[in-house]
Amino acid sequence: MNSSTNTLPKTVYAIQHLAFEDLGSLEHVFDQLGYRVRYFEAGVDDLRPALNYDGLTIILGGPIGVYESEDYPFLLDEITGLKQRLHDHKPTIGICLGAQLIAHALGAKVYAGHQKEIGWSQLQISAVDHNPLSALNGIEVLHWHGDTFDLPENA
């Protein structure tokens, strides 16, 4: 995110699915790059400003499944807004449930995995020399999920 070539707004929007699940170490990276973070809580806040935002929006995780919209009806509006956001090619990152929501919005199947993945491993960042998130390369991150998804077409 070189300031001479970056035209993104200097605020990152993040959609939470639990109030205590935030950006963690990633927030420090954005802070070091001069970005502020504004959080929106799914099911509580109006997500339209985050989903319509021209800058980077990060969709975070949570202990729910994409396929649980009957129990979590806010997912339907979030998915609808996410489909439009992706159609408009707005910068979007999905972490955990967020990645599942993006896959679903792009037409991929999201489903319960054969077994849960729980544990720590090192994050591997691709194209480290040109990646604004390269500061995270090699850090230990927690994996804790039971759902998985097929890659969307052309991903």
Question: Where are the model-predicted features located?
Answer:
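Extreme N-terminal starter segment of soluble prokaryotic enzymes
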Residues: 7-13
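Catalytic nucleophile loop
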Residues: 85-109
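Glycine-rich His-Gly loop
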Residues: 15-18, 59-63, 146
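Pocket-forming structural segment of enzyme catalytic cores
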Residues: 106-155
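Short N-terminal binding/cap micro-motifs at the start of the first secondary-structure element
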Residues: 20-25
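Flexible gly/pro-rich beta->alpha loop and the following alpha-helix that scaffold active-site loops
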Residues: 28-93
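Cofactor-binding loop segments of dinucleotide-utilizing enzymes, especially the Rossmann-like FAD-
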Residues: 15-17, 42, 97
